[in-house]
Swiss-Prot record:
Binding site for IMP: 313, 348-350, 371-372, 395-399, 425
Physiological role: Catalyzes the conversion of inosine 5'-phosphate (IMP) to xanthosine 5'-phosphate (XMP), the first committed and rate-limiting step in the de novo synthesis of guanine nucleotides, and therefore plays an important role in the regulation of cell growth.
Record's protein name: Inosine-5'-monophosphate dehydrogenase
SMART domains given in the database record: CBS (SM00116), IMPDH (SM01240)
Organism the protein comes from: Halobacterium salinarum (strain ATCC 700922 / JCM 11081 / NRC-1)
Cross-referenced CDD domains: CBS_pair_IMPDH, IMPDH
Record keyword Cytoplasm present: no
Lineage: Archaea, Methanobacteriati, Methanobacteriota, Stenosarchaea group, Halobacteria
Cofactor: K(+)
Amino acid sequence: MANDSSTDGRFSEKLRVPEALTFDDVLLRPAESRVEPDDADVATRVSTNVELEVPVLSAAMDTVTESRLAIAMAREGGLGVLHQNMDTDRVVAEVERVKRADELVIDRENVVTAAPEQTVEAVDEMMDRSDVSGAPVVDDDDTVRGIISATDIRPYLEVGESDAVREAMTDEVITAPEDITARDALELMYEHKIERVPIVNDEQHLVGLVTMQGILERREHGSAARDQNGRLRVGVAVGPFDTERATAVDEAGADVLFIDCAHAHNLNVIDSAREIKASVDADVVVGNVGTREAAEAVVDFADGIKVGIGPGSICTTRVVTGSGMPQITAVSQVADVAAPAGVPVIADGGIRYSGDAAKAIAAGADAVMLGSYFAGTDEAPGRVITMNGKKYKQYRGMGSVGAMQSGGSDRYLKDDDEDEEYVPEGVEAATPYKGSLASELHQLVGGIQSGMGYVGAESIPAFKADAEFVRVSAAGQTEGHPHDVMITDEAPNYSPQGE
């Protein structure tokens, strides 16, 4: 009889496995409370130096977050994270677009200007590329000579597009000094019926620009996420080995860099992340991880840790690789390490309902990141699709074949080789069209606040400290959803599939 070397049990012992839970496995235990949901404070910290009024980030996916959605997120108090399927020049331009969106005084280096001798056609194309509707006209020494707007240009595009800007511009320019206040600038614009005022120094040289839109946006969005200069905050995903991109977006003004890797508990990734952290001024969040050991490997240098190995709706990592960690357990394990060190935790993926977001925070997360939840909004870049008379928007995982072909293979530590067939870890799909991001975010944050009210927690730190969980059986999960009825009027924050 052959000698059986497996009698020591070293393999069968692997099957004595710990339990791991996800959102549907648990519920928050209601507790005595004096906290009204509207009074619950959801302000939080997502990295060492970045605080938000709402604990929500949009995912760095090419069908979710580009500058338009990032601007909308920041205005509502959250943070948009620009995806990495863009070349460096384009992502720098996207960062600058976010930073320029709500500035009170746009700094000179960010002001789009025209020269008197340029053609009307060239300036029209320039303004279209820069997404602005007007520009000061300046000489070589930056002396303001006029101002030109899309309204000035429009008649010339039909009959005189080769005419010089000096022919089309308004040369009687209303300017303002460097110390002008928002109120004074607004009054000046109303008085002269103009939408933009160049800011000049004593020599009449251009030093900045104030716009009506910028002032009104700042007034409307009092809880917006802003940096120390009053500009909207923005995050950027960078590949784990792309130091050049990290440096470029840091110089462009990005507030947080997200090391964007499906498995950040890779020693090569960690070494490179340390180097990136040392080379930039922005905060650096490392992810994704899913275990206590992974958190221990990065907690000494990371400004934040992002959690999620395969929980996303379009992610196939767990079935393709057989690897992953259910999200509630993953968040709690990482938080056990990160919280004592004062490092924020971001739960990334698997959140279908606002209650899932509340559970993630109660389990130790400081904020949540969502993809499909925002992919169906107006501001997301995915194209609109109509199927069976219903509108959807394109949504795909960054591990899908399409996303990898667009440059996302770096996230999965795979070479970008056109001759090699990809092994995807995601799918391409569609998500129902939802309307504005502000409406979706309102429902999400409102659900989190209601969860805090049930627990009796008036702040995110109190919620994390005081919340308790109970296990839920399969019957309990069924009981928790609408049952034994036919839904006739859909609620804005619920669908049976969690769409």
